[in-house]
């Protein structure tokens, strides 16, 4: 009875409340740091985490600068905590080779956040395991040289709009932010190639497609919500998935409806009436496709080895086969949406960086202009294969640009099973982050890494280059699928521009460029130059 009396809330309410508060605070304190011993147990050095949020404040300047600092302080193997999630950062080429190639079967998937929403959740970027392999097999054959040639006229049409826009700045002689011009241009290309829609972004900024693109890329998660998601993922991630998000739903709904309407129209048309674009190429592969095995998935290796000749069609030796599960409409929509993300952000940033480097390195630009003039005499209407073979110095300039400023400067792989990588124990579920930027700026592999030097990428220099020290588009079976299309667009764009103009630095040109590193690496304040008629 005395015990019951002691527990009676009427007699001891304040004491019970205080005891519960103490227990709750103790549990909260334990929870706030309980996840932060795993890196130490693995013997991986890392910055000291803060309760709940881990090392979130370490990245307040951006991932680019923080990766450089991690490499400087802790070497090519380090780690950090993103909220409660452990991330292992690698920039050692031998370890990267193991993860991306030799032990790829254990590192097939990218990191899943649980926050992916349709339609991008159905893209090749986020598909996992067997379904990723099936869809990748289908899409690999969509990027053959023969099919890429069909896209060249669509890209050239958008180039004509860009050139007309640049002509005005050439006539005025004023300094301007060419990154904004490239934003409009890549929007036009994406609309035409992936969505079957013609737009002129610079003249029609309020066009629904253009407006929804702006809204999509302006979207960001409020800082408080991000902190809560990272601190309490088991509660906040499911909650974030079910709570309505009007802006996100409107943007996703617009692109979803647009693509589905185009698909419905194409299905009603005869084959010869259908527009030949990327969307149609994917639609043609919905039910059967050339059988392309995982060993043929490394599109990046094929793209960068093609300087010796036009790359072979990866689908050529294989016969069409029925898919175990045909591409769903959702998956077709997902690939088009991914094209928007990569085709806008990556291409815009790469064009901006190469323009800046040419403007601030006039000797390199002069050498490139001579090559462009010689090439144009031989190929007045260039196609994919001629662009691959005929512009070796442009290839060198682009390669060095992508070394200095890799737009996709980090990417992840997730361990499916416990394993060891060069003696380092990696538990199942561990996320490995490849720090491409830190790798590309490591003086051990790239002497004087801050200097723009296209001669690093002569044929002889590339033969001597250590494998897996240059990864602008990843490597291995899960490397960037659209690399050949991306390079085609960049080369074709620069070819069209440099036939008519040259880039010049001016007082408004920011040297060195300040960088912004959120989802991709980009110039923080644009790229201001002058453009001069030739």
From Swiss-Prot:
GO biological process, one term: icosanoid metabolic process
Tissues in which the UniProt entry reports expression: Expressed in lung, kidney and thymus.
Cofactor(s) listed in the protein's UniProt record: heme
Enzyme Commission number: 5.3.99.5, 4.2.1.152
Sequence positions that bind heme: 480
Parts of the chain that traverse the membrane: 11-31, 76-96, 224-244, 337-357
Domain of life: Eukaryota
SUPFAM superfamilies assigned: Cytochrome P450
Lumenal side: 32-75, 245-336
Subcellular location: Endoplasmic reticulum membrane
Topological domain ranges for the Cytoplasmic compartment: 1-10, 97-223, 358-534
Record's catalysed reaction(s): prostaglandin H2 = thromboxane A2; prostaglandin H2 = (12S)-hydroxy-(5Z,8E,10E)-heptadecatrienoate + malonaldehyde; a hydroperoxyeicosatetraenoate = an oxoeicosatetraenoate + H2O; (15S)-hydroperoxy-(5Z,8Z,11Z,13E)-eicosatetraenoate = 15-oxo-(5Z,8Z,11Z,13E)-eicosatetraenoate + H2O
Family under the similarity heading: Belongs to the cytochrome P450 family.
Self-association state and partner proteins as the record states: Monomer.
Function description: Catalyzes the conversion of prostaglandin H2 (PGH2) to thromboxane A2 (TXA2), a potent inducer of blood vessel constriction and platelet aggregation. Also cleaves PGH2 to 12-hydroxy-heptadecatrienoicacid (12-HHT) and malondialdehyde, which is known to act as a mediator of DNA damage. 12-HHT and malondialdehyde are formed stoichiometrically in the same amounts as TXA2. Additionally, displays dehydratase activity, toward (15S)-hydroperoxy-(5Z,8Z,11Z,13E)-eicosatetraenoate (15(S)-HPETE) producing 15-KETE and 15-HETE.
Protein name as it appears in the record: Thromboxane-A synthase
